[in-house]
């Protein structure tokens, strides 16, 4: 992570501007200085996952130019900030707690932001803070990273929606993979079909892991 300007000062100043602000983050750019995912406008849910199966994203309809990046040149309220530039008020951390130790790589900032919102604090995207996030932008997620992505997803849904919610999101995720495998078989795209088969197998492997079995008890 590299600072493109006085980003820390911009975030710190904004955080101190109101006691109602619990956390904030800036705009992230990739290594080619192109905008990349900086925040999320909604929290993960069964509804959004089901819509994604049909390639439907209501957020992209309401915010076609700024789904995950702030192009407004002014602070906007969001659901969660990417962990690479998440700044949280110390008193808020004392109240809601820090990152949950169950997470390894993914969803830990999402779950923390969810707790911050439940405590009645706002979270903002501050575009004046500009930061380079040195992370790969490959179209296909590597299997090793995908494993921890699924693991984080199940831990998040277990914490937020309970055991039933965790089982339901597994079923939806598997359904999506089966549909994509059939879709790309019919479209004659063996590479994409193999990728989704890998996702299906990785998801099943995560679900059957000892860590996930423990959180389902």
Locate each region found by the language model:
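Generic structural signal for small/hydrophobic residues in well-ordered secondary structure
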Residues: 24-26, 33, 89, 116, ...
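Non-catalytic, C-terminal membrane-associated alpha-helical segments of glycosyltransferases
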Residues: 144-152, 164-217
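Short, flexible, basic/aromatic active-site loop/helix in glycosyltransferases
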Residues: 43-79
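A short, conserved alpha-helix in the catalytic core of glycosyltransferases
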Residues: 71-73, 77-98, 102-130
């Amino acid at each position: 992570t590299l600072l493109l300007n006085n980003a820390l000062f911009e975030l710190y100043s904004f955080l101190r501007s109101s006691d109602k602000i619990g956390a904030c983050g800036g705009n992230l750019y990739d290594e080619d200085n192109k905008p990349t995912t900086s925040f999320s406008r909604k929290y993960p849910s069964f509804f959004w996952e089901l819509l994604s199966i049909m390639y439907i994203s209501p957020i992209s309809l309401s915010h076609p130019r700024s789904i995950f990046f702030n192009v407004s040149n002014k602070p906007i309220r969001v659901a969660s900030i990417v962990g690479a530039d998440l700044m949280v008020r110390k008193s808020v951390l004392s109240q809601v707690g820090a990152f949950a130790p169950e997470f390894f790589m993914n969803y830990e900032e999402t779950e923390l932001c969810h707790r911050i919102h439940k405590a009645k604090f706002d979270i903002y995207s501050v575009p004046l803070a500009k930061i380079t996030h040195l992370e790969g932008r490959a179209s296909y997620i590597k299997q090793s990273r995908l494993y921890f992505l699924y693991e984080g997803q199940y831990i998040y849904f277990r914490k937020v929606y309970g055991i039933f919610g965790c089982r339901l999101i597994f079923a939806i995720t598997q359904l999506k993979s089966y549909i994509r495998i059939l879709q790309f078989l019919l479209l004659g795209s063996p590479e994409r079909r193999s990728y989704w088969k890998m996702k299906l197998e990785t998801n099943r492997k995560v679900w059957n892991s000892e860590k996930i079995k423990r959180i389902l008890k």
